[in-house]
Amino acid sequence: MNDAANSIATIVATRVFSPTMAVLWAAFWNFAAIFIFGVSVAHTMGEGIVEASRINEYLIFAALIGSVIWVWLCTHFGMPISVSHALIGGLIGPVWFTFGSDALVASGIIKIAVFIVLSPLIGMILGFFTMCLTMLIFRRKHPLKVEGLFKGLQLFSSAIFSLGHGANDAQKTMGIIAILLYSVAGSNTFVSEYLYENTGSFHVPVWLIVTCYSVIALGTIVGGKKVIKTLGDGLARLKPVQGFCAETSGALTLMGTAVLGIPVSTTHTITGAIIGVG
């Protein structure tokens, strides 16, 4: 819900949409991502961080408990935290403790670690150059005309950012659920018959894809309004042109990493983009 609010906080800040309309707009495009993106991020979460064959329900439980405790502690002490990264770390910890480093997929972990740093930097750099290019193109236009134009364009930029957010964040959850189902499908008849076909290899069932995208859209509707209003008010000085450039830059970063199968933080990405636009 917090990341959903981040995805369209700028259109509330610039008064393009009310908080209610903003969360409905975000929810629609969160779900629409199901028709555009594959499940590369889900596969990374399921088999690109730890060896899927080593996973069992106890390790998943430990991963979830560990990440929840860490997020709660950081929130309690006012420390900025990415839930996505906490979940990834929570998965690595118990697997490493139980099986050692041989059960870890080093290439996947390195890729994620690199993009923890790169995703906000890419967002910031794209934001800076997008803002510079926009200012160059519209330097001779009247400020009021430019503001009106970019209020309209923010509908597009917020939509594609919500697409990127949906593609990345929904797949993180489906990857964790899929690996849990994969781990028990061999020994649980109900799971293998009705929930997860035991093919011997990791995959993401269609029903799970639809469910995760539906849940992220519903979560945006149910809990996003309060958070997005707070974020929007906090960004009250942001102009429509800045909002457009930040969202477009953040969207390009999120969609690019989703295609590459790299789970990144929506919060960190949009923060970097906002810094980049100044």
Residue ranges and their predicted role:
Residues 1-278:
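Multi-pass alpha-helical transmembrane bundle typical of ion/small-solute transporters
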